Amino acid sequence: EVNKANTTFIDTILEHSHDGRIHCDFHPLRSDGGGTVTGRFSSSNPNLQQIPARDPYIKKLIRGLFIPEEGSKWGSFDYASQEPRWLVHYCATLTGFDRHPQIDDVVDLYHKGEADFHQIVADIAGIPRKQAKTVNLGLMYGMGKGKLANILDLSVEEATALLNKYNDKVPFLKSISEKTTRKASESGIIRTWLGRKCRFNMYEPKSYKYNKAMPMKEAINEYGGKGSIRRAFTYKALNRLIQGSS
């Protein structure tokens, strides 16, 4: 661990230091140089977003390299449960048959500053908080039943039963997921809160067998006509919306 920290962080930090300061590169858009699909920033040279924080010994060694200006102090600020907040916001925008009265109670709890989203869902669904948190995050990241079963150490049948119970008791989360996926499938675009476009312009065959996603013309030639293909990765639409808005 110490050797890894030395080669991954310390060497890189020293390499890019200039007059005792570090000026890393931030990437707001995905490119060969970095960036993320959702529009979240990444950094490099060095990656100051990944400075170790968990191991107490390594954390002290590496974070101790950074000191504030004389007479100044560091401040640490972070958003509280930013992704769940956005998820609740978008659930509250649902209308018609997609809207469920339960979401209004969740919004009220957020307004009162009393919200623990994962516990709220756990209470509504009647499942342990750990399971609720895993399903909540899995919903935002497009997790399948197999991976859910593996993480929670359940059989696929048990994971399926858990998801069915979750969707029955907390229908507004399934509704926003399905609506976002449907939007991405039909238009190929979803927009984040500030208007950034997240495009779904790759295609795959409609069969559930895994095949490589391709641009439309290539997919038509490879998989046998426009009627046999669909937009790829639309199951990630909710994740793109939440991460991109955050």
Where are these regions (language model features)?
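Conserved catalytic core of nucleotide polymerization and phosphodiester-bond processing enzymes
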Residues: 1-246
